[in-house]
Swiss-Prot record:
Pfam families: H2O2_YaaD. This is UPF0246 protein Vapar_1301. PANTHER family: PEROXIDE STRESS RESISTANCE PROTEIN YAAA, PEROXIDE STRESS RESPONSE PROTEIN YAAA. One of its GO terms (biological process) is response to hydroperoxide. One of its GO terms (cellular component) is cytosol. Belongs to the UPF0246 family.
Length: 261
């Protein structure tokens, strides 16, 4: 069973990573691979073009143009850091990779995947060079008008390879719709289970973006801590007050709810 997460816009290359944490190379990051092909396209654009393409400020555009120029075909401890430690945002606050033991990180490496506009798919310990390229970016390429066309069935096919040894392949989607859309459902040979997180607001339950993002990371963390092997096992998820709501759920859509106070 694999868990899919979205990446984060904000990055942390300052907080030290424990020295005993190993590092691996991303699957699609060969010098002439898909990631390098995208970097080549991005390097052809000016800061103003990047600003318009990604709706960034002048300062952020200049920063990312510099990042594209500095990007190399292979991440090293000097120019990159492990994805689960580099991404910094609500999801990764919930995951809290720094508090996981080496054994837990090893399990996460086998069962947690991070979708990425530039890298396609990352494992938590894959080396990540600084970048900005959201999956929804309309970056024209030889495959089509955007990154969904660029990645095509490649992400789904790689997931199939990762799941090939599982008797009943399952993908647990705790990524945003923008990112999960990059997984070609027709090519994916696995059952997909979606997890939804709702808060009690006023007189009903509803999804609150900030809390939902953190909850996605929390669920991935819980799965790592408990080595969750089936969707049924996820029904016991209970971090930070969430509980499984059987009446609101289906076999393919697990709903977790909580009330404050």
């Amino acid at each position: 069973m694999l868990f899919l997460l979205s990446p984060a816009k904000s990055l942390d290359y300052d907080t030290p990573v424990p020295t005993e944490v190993p590092a691996t190379q991303p699957h699609f990051e060969a010098p002439r691979g898909p990631s390098a092909e995208l970097i080549k396209l991005l390097r052809e654009k000016s800061p103003q073009q990047i600003s318009e393409l990604m709706h960034l400020s002048e300062k952020l555009s200049a920063l990312n143009v510099a990042r594209y120029q500095a990007w190399s075909g292979k991440g090293t401890p000097k120019n990159a850091r492990q994805a689960a430690f580099a991404f910094d945002g609500d999801v990764y606050g919930g995951l809290d990779a720094r508090s996981l033991t080496p054994t837990q990180l090893a399990w996460a490496q086998e069962h947690v995947c991070i979708l990425s506009g530039l890298y396609g798919l990352l494992r938590p310990l894959d080396l990540l060079q600084p970048y900005r390229l959201e999956m929804g970016t309309p970056l024209a390429n030889r495959h089509g008008k955007d990154l969904y066309a660029f990645w095509g069935a490649r992400i789904a096919e790689h997931l199939n390879q990762r799941l090939a040894a599982d008797r009943t392949p399952v993908v647990v989607n705790v990524a945003s719709q923008e990112y999960f859309r990059s997984v070609d459902r027709k090519a994916l040979k696995a059952r997909v289970v979606e997890c939804v997180f709702e808060e009690w607001k006023g007189d009903r339950y509803k999804i609150v973006s900030f809390y939902a993002k953190r909850a996605r990371g929390l669920l991935a963390r819980w799965a790592v801590l408990h080595k969750a092997a089936t969707p049924k096992a996820l029904e016991k998820f209970d971090l930070e007050g969430y509980g499984f709501d059987a009446t609101a759920s289906t076999a393919e859509r697990l709903v977790f709810r909580r009330k404050f106070g």
